[in-house]
Swiss-Prot record:
GO CC annotation terms, alphabetical: cyanelle
InterPro entries the record matches: Fe-S_cluster_assembly_SufBD, SUF_FeS_clus_asmbl_SufB, SUF_FeS_clus_asmbl_SufBD_core, SUF_FeS_clus_asmbl_SufBD_sf, SufBD_N
One of the protein's GO biological processes: iron-sulfur cluster assembly
Cell compartment(s), UniProt: Plastid, Cyanelle
The keyword S-adenosyl-L-methionine belongs to this UniProt entry's keyword annotation: no
Pfam name, any one: SufBD_N
Stated family: Belongs to the iron-sulfur cluster assembly SufBD family.
Protein name: Iron-sulfur cluster assembly SufBD family protein ycf24
Keyword vocabulary terms for this entry: Cyanelle, Plastid
Length: 486
């Protein structure tokens, strides 16, 4: 075993134990509602958002279904104490005296805060060719490049704004992919979500900018329940990226989001996530519970949805970005890197549901386990009886660092059409003494060696991220691997 205390390897120890740099809560005057979840809470959230009646009914229907479910799902390979849903704040937002009409009206302190977090929103410094919607606790505080996008007919705004301005689109698509009765956490989200992003790409338009949403949980007693809805009309294309951080608290916060994607005929949606929620301290105390439902519907012929995710944060991750391949010749893709360290737990993967003819799906999953963490891949490939000529390829690779981490793979294949072709391969490997020694002999220290091995292991996934975010994701993995060889 490699001695991480030797002078040559001390850099690796430092690399692995880097402090979480987004950990300080930001000080603002905050508007909240009382803890607890009742029908009155739902009505109060809807009232604060000034919502039409159909949205209140949508929420109440979800809340009543959630009450009927009574228990969280227990099949995931996860261990955590029971969540007290009555000891949580369901609405938290920076106080604002009036509705904001432009970035110029946003509190300068708030803008400065996002800049410190690496998300500049001001005109002079904002990210080139990337439109950003910044979500702070329960509300959107700023959206960039809205006017430029509007010239192309692209709608990109907070979902609360879309409810007011585009009710017909919301009625048609909200809940069409993830219903109000889908699962325990999606029901909770549908009942209490207060913001998120809405995007509509009109027919035959290729969105001229990358779209991005940045999520920040700042209140230690509140959960975050954002909802994202993206609709790509016929012949359109959009690339969307989300990122997230949270302060360090000794207690756990709940993040229960829902993402719905709809791709019509010949449309393509590329959805990328770099998730860096606070993962807890070195003893496993604190951190975010990341219980998320993400699903895309390839509703039209020749449509395509690609999920790419880099998961490095949160104490517990429970998410399965999925594709329902309804349209003939539609394509679903899933590229994932899930890194766990210390006492993190992840149960993540995907579902590919083949319904239409000649549908294709591709799954590339890379799991990296270090410290005392456990990392599970769970995948479902389902070929329906009418999915003539369906094709799937799945590759699930796990990499272990150290002697105390775990990696698990739970593939599930349901094939009901004899013309289908399904391939599945999996591997588990470990970074060993010989590999590190090989690098050391060539003048490369252990810190760089680990980074190079990890980078090569994840390259196929990083290649599917927008270039500037692929570079950041590569750095992020290096920073997260603290004390991982011993």
């Amino acid at each position: 075993m490699v001695n991480t205390q030797s002078p040559k390897n001390s850099g690796l120890e430092n690399l692995v134990n880097q402090p979480y740099k987004y950990g300080l809560p930001l000080i603002f005057e905050i508007e909240t509602i009382s803890k607890g979840l009742t029908e009155e809470t739902i009505r109060l959230i809807s009232e604060k958002k000034n919502e039409p009646q159909f949205m209140l009914e949508f929420r109440l229907q979800a809340y009543r279904k959630w009450l009927e479910m009574s228990n969280e799902p227990e099949w995931a390979h996860l261990n955590y104490p029971k969540i007290n849903y009555q000891d949580m704040v369901y609405y938290s937002a920076p106080k604002q005296k009036k509705k904001l009409q432009s970035l110029d009206e946003v509190d300068p302190t708030l803008l400065e805060t996002f800049e410190k977090l690496g998300i500049p929103l001001t005109e002079q410094k904002r990210l080139a060719n990337v439109a950003v919607d910044a979500i702070f606790d329960s509300v959107s505080v700023a959206t960039t490049f809205k006017e430029e996008l509007a010239k192309e007919g692209v709608i990109f705004c907070p979902i609360s704004e879309a409810v007011q301005k585009y009710p017909d689109l919301i009625k048609k698509y909200l809940g069409s992919v993830v219903s109000t009765s889908d699962n325990y956490f999606s029901c909770l989200n549908a009942a209490v979500f207060s913001d998120g992003s809405f995007c509509y790409i009109p027919k035959n338009v290729r969105c001229p900018l990358e779209l991005s949403t940045y999520f920040r949980i700042n209140n230690g007693e509140s959960g975050q329940f954002e909802r994202t809805l993206i609709v790509a009309d016929e012949g359109s294309y959009v690339s969307y990226l989300e990122g997230c951080t949270a302060p360090q608290f000794d207690t756990n916060q709940l993040h229960a989001a829902v993402v719905e994607l709809v791709a019509l005929d010949n449309a393509e949606i590329k959805y990328s996530t770099v998730q860096n929620w606070y993962a807890g301290d070195e003893n496993g105390k604190g951190g975010i519970y990341n219980f998320v439902t993400k699903r895309g519907l390839c509703a039209g012929k020749n449509s395509k949805i690609s999920w790419t995710q880099v998961e490095t944060g949160s104490a517990i991750t429970w998410k399965y970005p999925s594709c329902v391949l309804l349209g003939d010749n539609s394509i679903g893709e899933f590229y994932s890197v899930a890194l766990t360290n210390r006492y993190q737990q992840a149960d993540t993967g995907t579902k590919m549901i083949h319904i239409g003819k000649n549908t294709r799906s591709r799954i590339i999953s890379k799991g990296i386990s270090a410290g005392h963490s456990q990392n599970s891949y769970r995948g479902l490939v389902k070929i329906g009886p009418k999915a003539v000529g369906a094709r799937n390829y799945s590759q699930c690779d796990s990499l272990l660092i150290g002697d105390n981490s775990q990696a698990n793979t739970f593939p599930h294949l349901q094939i009901k059409n004899p013309t289908a072709k399904v391939e599945h391969e999996a591997s588990t490997s470990k970074i060993g003494e010989e590999q590190i020694f090989y690098f050391l002999q060539r003048g490369i220290n252990a810190e760089e060696a680990i980074s190079l091995i990890i980078s090569g292991f994840c390259r196929e996934v990083f290649n599917n991220l927008p270039m500037e975010f692929a570079l950041e994701a590569d750095k992020l993995l290096g920073l997260k691997l603290e004390g991982s060889v011993g």
